[in-house]
Amino acid sequence: MAAGRGLRMMPLTTNTSKAMIQFNNAMLIGNSLKQLKKLDLQSISITVGYKGAELAEYAIKEGVHNIFNTNEKGNAWWMYNTLLKQLDAPLLVLTCDNIVEIDLEWISAQYLKHNSPTCMLIPVTPVDGIEGDFIQTKNNQIINLSRTEKTPIYGSGIQILNPKKINDCTEKADNFYDVWTQLIAQELLIASETYTKTWYSINTEAQLHTAEKLYT
């Protein structure tokens, strides 16, 4: 997911997309793409928005198979309005602003352990200064998401989901919070165990500089 405008990172995003900001001598999105290219995946897709042509050109050179223009759309729009809606298989969802060590073997094992749910969020331990949706669970079933009711875990931005299953059991929604709300009501939103690999989210210029120091 790389269509965000990145307003909180102005002026760095005045003339480029958030995904194309320089991070440790590479593009911010390149941290994940480099890892994904080494995995046995059927395809890699990205969403683009602001300065989408520039990002799409870079992504294709980096081995991305599908580009979806979601400019001025919500972050879940692609799931109901592109060919991915027909995908009846696990789809790993990442955000371009995460600095994360992708342990696909662990994520896949968690997905199978929880009986291949419609949607599974990957929680992390909260990091000071980084906002997130706090997750309340009962036997790994998510019963509430909140920005104010603090819990020991919150969403990392990493999910594994089945687009066709989601289309079959929810009404169209533009943003993930509305999708998750529908799934919670049907007891279909699951949380994995807490992710312990490297994870950091970049939403501001200060966080970018912090990440550069932490993950050089």
Q: Can you annotate each of these PLM segments?
A:
Residues A2, V48, T95, I122-P123:
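Short beta-strand/turn micro-motifs composed of small residues
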Residues Q42-I44, P90, P117-T118, I160, ...:
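Residues at the starts of beta-strands that form the adenosine-phosphate
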Residues T16, K61-G63, K138:
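Short, structured coil segments at secondary-structure junctions
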Residues H114-V124:
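A short, conserved acidic/glycine-rich loop-to-beta-strand motif
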Residues L92, I99, S108-L112, P126-V127, ...:
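Catalytic-core segments of class I nucleotidyltransferases/pyrophosphorylases
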